[in-house]
Amino acid sequence: MSVAERFISIPVEVCIPVTLPNPFTATRHMLHGGDYNPDQWLHRPDILESDPELMDRAGVNTVSLGIFSWAAMEPNEGDFRFDWLDDVMDRLHKKEISVLLATPGAARPHWMGQKYPEVLPVNAEGVRQPCRGRHWFCRTSQVYRDKVHTINAELAQRYQSHPALLGWHINNEYGGAPGYAHCYCERCLAGFRSWLRRRYDDDLDRLNQSWWTTFWAHTYTDWSQIRPDDPTNESCLLNWYRYQSDLIVDFARHEIDAVKTFSAHPVTTNFHGHMSFFDHREMASLLDFLSFDAYPQIEGSAADRDRRRWVSYVSDMVRGFAPHRPWVLLESCPSQPQHKPLARLKRPGVHRSLSLQHVAHGADGVMYFQWRAGRGGKEKLHGAVVMHDTPADTRVFREVASLSSDLNRLKPVCGSSCPSSVAIVWDVHSEWAWQCNHGLTSEPSPRAQLPAHYEPFWTRGIGVDIVDSTADFSAYQLVIVPGVFLLRPGFADRLMAIATTGCHVVLHPLTGWVDDDLCVLPGGRLGPELREACGIYPEEIDFLRPDERVLLEPSEWVRGDAVKRCDLVRTDGAEVMITYQSDFYAGYPALTRKEYGQGAFWYCACGLEAQGYDRLYARLCEIAGVSGPLKTESTSLVIRERRSEETRFVFVLNLTQTPNRVSVGAGWVSALTGESISDEVVVGANDVLILSQPIEGR
């Protein structure tokens, strides 16, 4: 039973639970293309005629079509006009270009908001908002859900057998942007209260106790008193975020059901931004393949390296939402994104390098926003393969065509996996809890803590999955828990289970502060299970000024000083590996270990400098038996492995303008040229080397 059915009495049609094989192994080629918006050019038939020919020249094999086209598909209520879409689909098919056909519900036409005001959202002050922007609708509106279901079903019924149809692009960037996702109309508030009644077994006393509502006399005596617009009520706000997430996921389910009533083709929707608009793992369970939009700003500055690291870890995060399903980079910019502070052009070769970096981390396709830029609207200056109605013989067009040649040579990579022995845990419920929490404002959010812990593995080419606390950890040899502020039920048990079988689990001080309702854990931080597993008791924690350093005992385990935070813990069965050496912290444990079954729990009680994390994780990799596919001393190379049943593929990307050497050993072949490669090889400036080698015994 869906969220809608349970809490707001909206009927949801039954979905036919049939899907085709994933589009990557079925077609056995990398998807390459982009968002295509012919509805913006219906007044220019010459452009509509020329686009498929230009796409063919650029090596485009797939487009996302019709994403914001509702007004062109249904200019007036019930007046469906698909003739133009028929023509576009037919033209694309003649050039053997596949289509991810979009459902248009991310932006409703103006006539709908005018005729049915209930589809428009209400702000926290109770004011109905006018038509504007996109994602500007109420997800509990029966009218809006009916209209979305109707247009989706019309599309699916009409195009289910069209030979160009590869799959369905459901909606676009669910969650929109901050402020877009939440509606405070009475229907949404009633739905929230019903959602809470189910969560707390219709027991208001239990809710009051769980939320600690005696603070500031917030005790509720009737469910109708609960409102989510008071930021001081942290537990209420956290559950409002969860409710909103469930609404978004349920809305996606509603859209998918309408499509799959008629079409069994695979579905996706594009994730984006900072991944905390909703629970992406829940959304991923609805999708046949995942997709993501990435717009890193590469500007030729020292910050570029951090942005390239972001490309890697966000790709690992997307893959972690559904580890056994394929994913594709559904939006990227081939040139100059308009929404960055500095409108910097990509230097020659950067687009290729960035695109193949996503492929190295599991993407089975590279697509763009946008194929052709529109002449008007908010994104008219955003980069595209073809800019407006200008000639296509440009540097950007040529680079896109060149990348297409590379992707064609990488067909054997399609459907291959990214082996990882290390997991870093990031949980959206902790992110929401951090946003709702008052205090600790000097500390980075759980998401902002990821780069420091990801970096040591990234520089060594060690595969990492970024997963949430509900994941299956059984395949990992090393699990890092940097800042799971909120402990969800069962997480401690899963960590103890994998440690028993040989995994090394590393906890850090911003983990395990609050329970599922944002109240401090019983008995203090970490909770009773993890305190016992770690063999420590955290007594108090100090947060340091940016200029402060606390000396650490010289050891093999870390380099440098303690920074940012110093946790003062006492041991209760743990072995002390390092102690603090200065101030009143001197003598307290800074790093502890407790053997647990065949593995161990480690507790790093302080923040570390980059060199400190680098040394700590290098030692833990040695102990856990974790290594990358190639050994290199360079910190300017990205190395990532993918594996099919028969072949290993190792990607080596040089992030600098200086050639880099790497030792690869014997038996490799270039996946791009077929040339045999062995021993030491030079990777050119801003270049990419892709190695392939048969797996022994295959």
Model-predicted regions and their roles:
Residues H32-L42, F68-D83, P130-H149, E234-D250, ...:
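The substrate-binding groove and active-site-proximal loops of carbohydrate-active enzymes
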Residues E125-Y313, M317:
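Polysaccharide-binding and catalytic clefts of secreted carbohydrate-active enzymes
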Residues G34, M55, V63, L92, ...:
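Conserved, mostly hydrophobic/aromatic
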Residues W41-D56, T150-E154, H272-M283, R347-S355:
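Short, acidic/polar
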Residues R6-T62, P75, D90, V413:
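N-terminal carbohydrate-binding accessory modules
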Residues E49-R57, S64-V127, H254-F262:
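Aromatic-lined substrate-binding rim segments of carbohydrate-active enzymes
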Residues R28-H32, G59-N61, H93-V99, S161-L166, ...:
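Short, well-ordered coil/turn segments that N-cap beta-strands
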Residues I226, Y295-R698:
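Carbohydrate-binding surfaces of carbohydrate-active enzymes
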